[in-house]
């Protein structure tokens, strides 16, 4: 075949053949008036190179354990390899199965392999998979935004769609800044934020700067925005409230601390106070004390600052209301959500803004000066929209609220008397156990004891459930906890089985 083609034809053929053109584009310009023999020689060399590449790939696989070239967060040892998942059962390549009682990282709120969500994603793929958000909008994004804003009962005005919780926090920080630059007159001096100790808002540098977990920040000290982000105490009744102090007194103490921090930083320079409405992974599902956020909002309003609530973990139904701030009696200026938004079927996150900010943008520049390549991804929007419709149509938030109370009761009944369970707290389908060496003094175990990891591995390997470990619960270094977060459609019987297995894991690990 090749011997009968003209040299020019051969040049076009080789350039248009993906195997050759992408591997070595200059070849296209060197073939010239090649003979059929040289063409055969060339093709033989290319195929031989391809074979060598395959052999090299196999060598890498053979000599590196299972993967070797995949940069996992934990490299030694490599994690278990998931091969399939259905409902709440996860199957690994070694044949082991577990019941996922944490929904991954509070993500897979409907479980795995939901047919409705899969079909919604496929339907969107059949239309188009990607749209340049800088220039174009799309109906599926508009439908999702309408669904989400409707879920706030009109309290929020607009929603910005992206891929991760860290992106959402970065967006919130920039939105807060831009809000003050849209006002007339502008307030360019508002470049500071006040956040809390022990918090976590994401792993990108801006979001990590906002977080207050010592252990997670340590490696990157010197790169973080420490001149712009200032800190107050966590709202942690178990460790922060003094003996004999009432909740009301403790809340007032925290409000006074926030007020003093505004004064210290310069009240006219603060853009926002930032907090997780219910603290997630770093401190172990700690609900705010009654009245806390109303008191914090009052301080923010006093100084003209915004309230940013991070509900990446605790929001979208996880705690028994679609938004956790509904249970706190406040409406944030900016809110971030992610994990339960699309249930893990696609990477999706969102930032809500209220009418105050929306009005400022609309009467000002009419532009949000921010952007991500995959923001508002159509397939992700389709997944999130179907997940939220299922949650609404199947009344799953009410199921979380009702069975969440039962989950908390059973955990207290089964584990309150354990000598190393210092505190059990949570809300909805988001509960933690904090482990202590001494229950009376609340003294934590030594970090070197690795208690949270021990409980996690015991649950995984010996009991067959997922318990999510957390370290640094007390001060960012010492302290251990583990949390559970079942799928929203779990029944009362599911909860009973889960708690029984949680108790088994704790007793096996700690005695």
UniProtKB/Swiss-Prot annotation:
InterPro entries cross-referenced by the UniProt entry: Aminotrans_3, PyrdxlP-dep_Trfase, PyrdxlP-dep_Trfase_major, PyrdxlP-dep_Trfase_small
Cofactor: pyridoxal 5'-phosphate
Protein name: Aminotransferase FGSG_17085
NCBIfam families for this protein: PRK07483.1 (NF005685)
N6-(pyridoxal phosphate)lysine: modified positions: 339
Enzyme Commission code(s) on record: 2.6.-.-
Keywords, comma-separated and alphabetical: Aminotransferase, Pyridoxal phosphate, Transferase
Bridged cysteine pairs (disulfide): none
Biological role: Aminotransferase; part of the gene cluster that mediates the biosynthesis of the lipopeptide fusaristatin A. Fusaristatin A consists of a polyketide chain linked to three amino acid residues glutamine (Gln), dehydroalanine (dehydro-Ala), and beta-aminoisobutyric acid. The biosynthesis starts with formation of a linear polyketide chain by the highly reducing polyketide synthase PKS6. The gene cluster does not contain an acyl-CoA ligase or an acyl-transferase, and it is therefore predicted that the polyketide is transferred directly to the nonribosomal peptide synthetase NRPS7.
UniProt binding sites for pyridoxal 5'-phosphate: 165-166, 310, 372-373
Chain sites annotated for binding substrate: 200, 371
């Amino acid at each position: 075949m090749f011997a009968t083609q003209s040299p020019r034809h051969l040049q076009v053929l080789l350039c248009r053949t993906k195997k050759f053109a992408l591997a070595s584009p200059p070849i296209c310009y060197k073939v010239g008036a090649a003979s059929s023999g040289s063409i055969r020689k060339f093709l033989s060399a290319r195929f031989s190179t391809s074979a060598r590449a395959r052999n090299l790939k196999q060598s890498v696989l053979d000599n590196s354990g299972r993967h070797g070239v995949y940069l996992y967060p934990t490299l030694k040892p490599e994690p278990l390899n998931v091969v399939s998942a259905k409902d709440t059962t996860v199957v690994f390549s070694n044949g082991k199965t577990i019941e996922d009682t944490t929904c991954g990282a509070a993500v897979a709120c409907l479980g795995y392999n939901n047919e409705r969500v899969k079909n919604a994603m496929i339907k969107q793929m059949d239309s188009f998979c990607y749209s340049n958000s800088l220039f174009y909008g799309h109906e599926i994004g508009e439908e999702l935004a309408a669904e989400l804003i409707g879920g706030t009962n009109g309290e929020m005005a607009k929603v910005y769609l992206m891929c991760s919780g860290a992106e959402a926090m970065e967006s919130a920080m920039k939105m807060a800044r831009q809000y003050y630059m849209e006002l007339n007159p502008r307030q360019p001096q508002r470049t500071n934020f006040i956040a809390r100790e022990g918090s976590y808002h994401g792993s990108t540098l801006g979001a990590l700067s906002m977080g207050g977990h010592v252990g997670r920040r340590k490696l990157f000290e010197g790169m973080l925005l420490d001149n712009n982000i200032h800190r107050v105490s966590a709202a942690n009744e178990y460790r922060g409230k003094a003996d004999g102090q009432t909740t009301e007194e403790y809340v007032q103490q925290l409000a006074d601390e926030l007020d003093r921090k505004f004064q210290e930083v310069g009240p006219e320079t603060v853009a926002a106070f930032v907090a997780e409405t219910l603290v997630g992974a770093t401190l172990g599902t700690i609900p705010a004390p009654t009245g806390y956020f109303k008191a914090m909002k009052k301080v923010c309003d006093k100084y003209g600052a915004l309230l940013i609530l991070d509900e990446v973990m605790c929001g979208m139904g996880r705690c028994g209301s679609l938004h956790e701030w509904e249970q706190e009696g406040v409406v944030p200026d900016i809110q971030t959500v992610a994990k339960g938004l699309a249930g893990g079927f696609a990477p999706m996150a969102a930032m809500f803004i209220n009418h105050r900010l929306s009005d400022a943008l609309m009467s000002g520049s009419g532009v949000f000066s921010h952007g991500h390549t995959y923001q508002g991804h159509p397939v992700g929007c389709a997944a999130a929209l179907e997940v939220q419709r299922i949650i609404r149509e199947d009344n799953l938030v009410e199921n979380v609220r009702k069975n969440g109370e039962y989950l908390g009761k059973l955990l207290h009944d089964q584990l309150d008397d354990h000598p190393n369970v210092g505190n059990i707290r949570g809300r909805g389908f988001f509960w933690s156990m904090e482990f202590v060496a001494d229950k009376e003094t609340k003294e934590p175990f030594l970090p070197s004891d690795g208690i949270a990891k021990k409980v996690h591995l015991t649950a995984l390997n010996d009991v067959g459930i997922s318990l999510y470990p957390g370290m640094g619960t007390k001060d960012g270094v010492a302290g251990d906890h583990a949390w559970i977060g079942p799928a929203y459609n779990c029944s009362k019987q599911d909860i009973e089985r889960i708690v029984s297995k949680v108790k088994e894991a704790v007793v096996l690990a700690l005695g």
